Amino acid sequence: MPDIGLEEVEVTEILVKIGEEIKLDQGLITVEGDKASMEIPSPISGIVKDITIKIGEKVKTSSIIMIFKVNNLNSIKNEKDLNYIKTEKKLNENFLEEKKDIKKIVLVHATPVVRRLARHLNVDLKNITPSGPKNRILKEDIELYIRNNTSNKSSFNIEKNNTTNFHKDLFNEIPITNIQQIIGKNLHQNWVNIPHVTQFDEVNITLLEEFRHKYNTEKKQKNNMCSKITILPFIIKSVAYGLLEFPIFNSSLSVNKKTIFLKKYVNVGIAVDVQNALFVPVLKNVDKKNIANLSSELIFLSKKAHENKLDASDMKDGCFTISNLGGIGGSWFSPIINSPEVAILGVSKALIKPLWNGKEFIPSLMLPLSLSYDHRVINGADAARFLTFIGKMLSDIRFLIM
């Protein structure tokens, strides 16, 4: 029984049978402690020769719960100062005749949650340096290992994609472009390295939409060639005010993760979907521009993106990113942070919903917003305040034009 931080636990479920062949990290038993149930994984691969515990029985750390026959000791790494699995000679006579020099088997100290995270990320726990009590591996140890080895592909046990060999007449192969590969790599790296949390909210934009439609109508009457202003410039401006009000959202984490850099400029990137690729042109000094200027610049950059004419200067020095899917549909989603930024705002399709005003239900246009943030830098309370502030800006046009 490995050390899971409790002296004694009760066995509530036995997940394997005698004679069954098990794999590394496969669940053996489920135990229940003072606060939660947890699954105890196998530290080795082998065949179950005996089960020494029963359901309802209480077991202590280091007590024998099962005995295995292991066919390949050469693949088992030796380490000192770790608990090891004991083998009874009388139950393994045939095996001991072939391998008399029994070596200690490594028992990695990690909770089932940490083990599942490692399996999901294809990380071998034996390569992790533990920092927890009693040499226990923590989730932070895995995150540190990944950050230190992201550029070194050989550090991971990347499993080959065992795609079924379909008959070639039954499917078409679509090559992944270089830009898609680069974008995919960056998205994966950001998702793995940044602890994402997403805050959701709805904003009443009824008055804003009335103002916007009236403004566009008047502009069209004066100049039929004038482009309509969409809701996005208003959102960009509200985000600019939010970044000034909450500077922690306009920051980046240092490489050594010990310092936060607060930026003295306000640049907002806009995710643009272009022919199966994703570009993020950046609007510079958003806090110093009015909504009409932002609308013109947004149209200009979007056109450059669709014509594949964006250069590096158009996509650098971003502080915060907005991903707008409102023109497509859907409600909420969890956008991936664009590192080294610490937050991103997702915008979905606005819908008419009944809103109670204290006396009656009023049809109101509600805009879903999804704020993903780096939990190492931003706490949940600040995220709620930031999103509430954005909602305040959008629900009353006077705040945006002052």
From Swiss-Prot:
It comes from the Bacteria. The modification N6-lipoyllysine is found at residue 35. Binds 1 lipoyl cofactor covalently. Residues 1-69 form the Lipoyl-binding domain. Forms a 24-polypeptide structural core with octahedral symmetry. Its cofactor is (R)-lipoate. Belongs to the 2-oxoacid dehydrogenase family. It comes from Buchnera aphidicola subsp. Schizaphis graminum (strain Sg). Residues 109-146 form the Peripheral subunit-binding (PSBD) domain. Its EC number is 2.3.1.12. It catalyses: N(6)-[(R)-dihydrolipoyl]-L-lysyl-[protein] + acetyl-CoA = N(6)-[(R)-S(8)-acetyldihydrolipoyl]-L-lysyl-[protein] + CoA. This is Dihydrolipoyllysine-residue acetyltransferase component of pyruvate dehydrogenase complex. The pyruvate dehydrogenase complex catalyzes the overall conversion of pyruvate to acetyl-CoA and CO(2). It contains multiple copies of three enzymatic components: pyruvate dehydrogenase (E1), dihydrolipoamide acetyltransferase (E2) and lipoamide dehydrogenase (E3). InterPro entries: 2-oxoA_DH_lipoyl-BS, 2-oxoacid_DH_actylTfrase, 2-oxoacid_DH_E2_comp, Biotin_lipoyl, CAT-like_dom_sf, E3-bd_dom_sf, PSBD, Single_hybrid_motif. One of its GO terms (cellular component) is cytoplasm. GO terms for biological process: pyruvate decarboxylation to acetyl-CoA. PANTHER family: DIHYDROLIPOAMIDE ACETYLTRANSFERASE COMPONENT OF PYRUVATE DEHYDROGENASE COMPLEX, DIHYDROLIPOYLLYSINE-RESIDUE ACETYLTRANSFERASE COMPONENT OF PYRUVATE DEHYDROGENASE COMPLEX. One of its GO terms (molecular function) is dihydrolipoyllysine-residue acetyltransferase activity. Keywords: Acyltransferase, Lipoyl, Transferase. Pfam families: 2-oxoacid_dh, Biotin_lipoyl, E3_binding.
